[in-house]
Amino acid sequence: KEDVINYIEENDKLPEFTVKSPTGEELHSDDLSGNTTLLVFFVTTCGDCKRELPKIDSVWNEMKDHPTFRLVTISRGKTTEVVNAFWKEQNFTMPFYLDPNEKVFSLFANSTIPRVYLVNRENIVTWMAVEQMSLSAKQLIGKIEQIM
């Protein structure tokens, strides 16, 4: 098994990337400046993702109306149809973006998901979790609010 390499760590600036929503709307990493962003990479078939994503959806439901909060949930390597079906099955309301060729993911790491990054207004990663978050949705909201 190859060693996990984190290309982006705490205190690093977000790399430049662009992702598309299922409707084709582009989001560029520069668009996140000035906001507090929770960035999440997942795959619909990953057990750890299935455990962590409901927490992320809870955070979204609690924080979505905050004007400077952004949630960028990125599906690694799956089609819109696959993610839509998974979202429906899980009753998620949070938005998602697609990384069909894993190009964006490869800027952050070579393997291991889910990955959760908390990013401040200057687009600097202030906290990250790989595989397991070990935080409840409420604790994660606390972390987000601390840096807003």
Regions found by a protein language model. Give the residues of each.
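A short beta-strand-turn-helix
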Residues: 17-37
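Short pre-active-site segment immediately N-terminal to redox-active cysteine/selenocysteine motifs
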Residues: 35-37, 42-45, 112
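Conserved redox-active cysteine motifs that mediate thiol-disulfide chemistry
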Residues: 41-58
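Thiol-based oxidoreductase modules, predominantly thioredoxin-like and allied folds used
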Residues: 67-80, 92-102
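Thiol-/selenol-based redox modules, centered on thioredoxin-like
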Residues: 118-148
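Short, internal strand/loop/helix patches
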Residues: 84-121
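Hydrophobic beta-strand anchors of alpha/beta hydrolase catalytic cores
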Residues: 38-39, 71, 116
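N-proximal helix/coil linker or "cap" segments that precede and/or mark the start of modular domains
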Residues: 1-16, 33
